[in-house]
From Swiss-Prot:
Gene3D superfamilies: ATP synthase delta/epsilon subunit, C-terminal domain (1.20.5.440), F0F1 ATP synthase delta/epsilon subunit, N-terminal (2.60.15.10)
Native organism: Nitrosococcus oceani (strain ATCC 19707 / BCRC 17464 / JCM 30415 / NCIMB 11848 / C-107)
Family per similarity comment: Belongs to the ATPase epsilon chain family.
The entry's keywords: ATP synthesis, Cell inner membrane, Cell membrane, CF(1), Hydrogen ion transport, Ion transport, Membrane, Transport
Descriptive protein name: ATP synthase epsilon chain
SUPFAM superfamilies for the chain: Epsilon subunit of F1F0-ATP synthase C-terminal domain (SSF46604), Epsilon subunit of F1F0-ATP synthase N-terminal domain (SSF51344)
Record bears the keyword Nucleotide-binding: no
Cellular component, GO, one term: plasma membrane
CDD domains according to UniProt: F1-ATPase_delta
Length: 140
């Protein structure tokens, strides 16, 4: 029998996922991390991006997180996200509109612009769109 671990993905609003997985991939600050059962304990910050879960049945689940923390214990992994949602639930039109607004804000040299905020909004929209693209590719 393959080794598994319990994963909880929780946002400020609600629990998004709770179940058994073989492996988790997450967008840590220093790059993507892959977590398997019995991984050494770890706490790291997450940047906006996709969390991917490989389930024992062979199924993969995709989630978008806007940032947060990843806590790893030998048999339990917790993703504490600022906001999180299943990739299938992301509104693609809204993500495209947010990307467009952020790109326009970054090009507006005369307006009062908070570059850090505009860049964060752009990164978030791009991460959402990537999550949508990956799930579409996976589903064929």
């Amino acid at each position: 029998m393959a080794m598994t671990m319990h994963v909880d993905i929780v946002s400020a609003e609600r629990e998004i996922f709770s179940g058994t997985v073989n492996m988790l991939f997450a967008p840590a600050e220093m790059g993507e991390v892959g977590i398997m059962p019995r991984h050494t304990p770890l706490i790291t910050r997450l940047k906006p991006g996709e969390v991917r879960l490989q389930r024992p049945e062979g199924q993969e689940d995709f989630f978008y997180v806007s940032g947060g923390l990843l806590e790893v214990q030998p048999h339990v992994v917790t993703v504490l996200a600022d906001t999180a949602q299943r990739a299938a639930d992301i509104d693609e039109a809204a993500a495209l509109a947010a990307k467009q607004r952020a790109e326009e804000a970054l090009q507006d040299r005369e307006g009062k612009l908070d570059y850090a905020r505009a860049q964060a909004e752009l990164a978030e929209a791009i991460a959402q769109l990537k999550a949508i693209q990956r799930i579409r590719k996976k589903l064929g």
